[in-house]
Amino acid sequence: MGGPHGGPFLLFHVLCFLLTLSEVGSQNSKACALPCPPNSSCVNGTACRCAPGFISFSGEIFTDPLESCDDINECGPPSPVDCGSSADCQNTEGGYYCTCSPGYEPVSGAMIFRNESENTCRDVDECSSGQHQCHNSTVCFNTVGSYTCHCREGWEPKHGLKNKQKDTICKEISFPAWTAPPGIKSRSLSAFFERVQKMSRDFKPAMAKKSMQDLVGSVDDLLKNSGDLESLDQSSKHVTVTHLLSGLEQILRTLAKAMPKGSFTYRSLDNTELSLVVQEQGKGNVTVGQSHARMLLDWAVAAAAEESGPTVVGILSSQNMKKLLANASLKLDSEKLKETYKSPVRGAKVTLLSAVSSVFLSNTNTEKLDSNVSFAFALHEQPELKPRQELICAFWKKDSNGNGSWATTGCWKMGRGNGSITCQCSHLSSFAILMAHYDVEDPKLALITKVGLALSLACLLLCILTFLLVRPIQGSRTTVHLHLCICLFVGSAIFLAGIENEGGEVGTRCRLVAVLLHYCFLAAFCWMSLEGVELYFLVVRVFQGQGMRKLWLCLIGYGVPLIIVGISAGAYSKGYGREKFCWLNFEGGFLWSFVGPVTFIVLGNAIIFVITVWKLTQKFSEINPDIKKLKKARVLTITAIAQLFVLGCTWVFGLLLFNPESWVLSYIFSILNCLQGFFLFVLYCLLNKKVREEYRKWACMVAGNKYSEFATTTSGSGSSHNQTQALRPSESGM
């Protein structure tokens, strides 16, 4: 570089190089006939080619000046790029690269690579490395490529969160709040819930097993020594049992979540059994069994859709629940039963034959299951079924008022054998096996009853009008007959209009009807007893008695039944009204408030009539008997005995009318009831000569004919007149 010609020589060479480049560029520009888009190059001066990693719509080489070269997505399908497992492909402008998926790291240390052969990704254990973000209420569990946060044992996710998620936050399992049902006043129930509250305060998840055993024992004590629970009305009992069943299901479901995984069975001293299974949801079926019941269901049914974690399946079976379920109603499938028995079914009397088994699952949405659940319930009795009886699979259905009743919708009996009944149900609740005795309505009997009562009412009305309007027969015995017919008329009218309790609930209307029927029919028997007393004054007391005054007759005839009904209603007002009929309740011997007085009256009248017949026999055996007067007295006695027989027999069968098993006797009662008013009309009106004369007179007056009364010649002796006066012929007339 130090020679004299060095500088000019170097400058000359630089100028020559620049001129050469200018010439080459000029030649290339002149060689390409069209402008090429970005990411492309000219080919042979007439076309363009996209750079590697780009592609045009027309292909690799194109001549369209409007064409463009777009990036090829090597990571999208279809693509020959394979980064291998646990790796993700990342597309770039004109290329791509591979990286390990989240939760994985490269063993080689190279963060990017080109294909599967260079893949060295392996799982990262976030739990052991401390890279997790689990809350301190959870435990970290590593998974392939990730991790999950599980609630600690005895803990559950907070409301709105799920278990086994990265954001899971848990709280310690607590004893659910459970208080007494509102409106139920019972010392036994209050003491039970005080014990429950103490369990709640002392509860620890680690002691869940003991807490469940204590809870079952407390329920046994409540039901075994029910105390004042027995005195509750039927509706309150059913509200109580509904509250107990639903509360037990909720608490046992919650406490079971704190139990270790596996099976658990507990049997109390009172034969109440608790069986449950706690485990991760499996595939196929799960079976839970005990001596009272066995259950088979799909794991998918048992698991809760909104929760993840151990699944709970359990059964609690109690025999003591039947104390609160006595006389519980059964909701019937009326159309199906009508088709079966070819006649409407008004109701059913049920008998509990098994323990009451309550089912609880992790899944709380059990009103409509995806697959049916199978049950086998052990029977405590092996009944022989009679006509109109059936064994049914029933469940306890809660209504909107907190009450409940038995129902069969969604449950089917599959078979019977080996002392058990198998069932299938499409929902879950509390189940039991019932023997239902159906009350099948007999249309013929209903028609006979309605027509017969209408006929009886018509005849009784004629009797009442006759006793009021026919003056020749007025007297104390006619007064007795009048009020007897009035009582029977009012009672029969109420019976015809209001005896049926169609709603099923015993309300004020039904109780009032039962009270009125009780009073009217008791009053009828009281007036019948007064006729026996009248006969006693007439015949036994040497034919000189003048009978009882009307005031005393009314006080006794209406006052005595009023006292009996008043005492009965005051002592036990709930004894009036039944589920199907507005009549006296059979429970607790309340029916004796009617049967007792009626039995006493019938027996008393029978004794009076025996004495009367005996006295008449003595009179006939005298040396100079007054045959005419004795014959009339005998007629009165015979009619009174006939009346006692008809009324007494009618109500002997009438008491059986309300027993669904006595449908044959119900026919007898209906027929006798039809003849009751007709018999009194014939006996005291049509067979009475004076009444017939009045009827004939009225008929002629209506027809417009003049009535002629032919006087009969009688002996004018004073003795004959005195005898007639003594017997009060205006009342006999026969």
Swiss-Prot record:
GO cellular component: extracellular region; plasma membrane
Entry membrane topology: Multi-pass membrane protein
Molecular function terms from GO: calcium ion binding; G protein-coupled receptor activity
Domain GAIN-B: 265-441
Disulfide bond entries: 32-42, 36-48, 50-69, 75-89, 83-98, 100-121, 127-140, 134-149, 151-170, 393-423, 411-425
Quaternary assembly: Forms a heterodimer, consisting of a large extracellular region (alpha subunit) non-covalently linked to a seven-transmembrane moiety (beta subunit). Interacts with complement decay-accelerating factor (DAF) and with chondroitin sulfate.
Sequence ranges on the Cytoplasmic membrane side: 471-478, 541-550, 615-637, 684-734
The protein, known as: Adhesion G protein-coupled receptor E5
Glycosylation sites: 39, 44, 115, 136, 285, 327, 372, 403, 418
Positions bearing Phosphothreonine: 713, 724
Site (Cleavage): 428-429
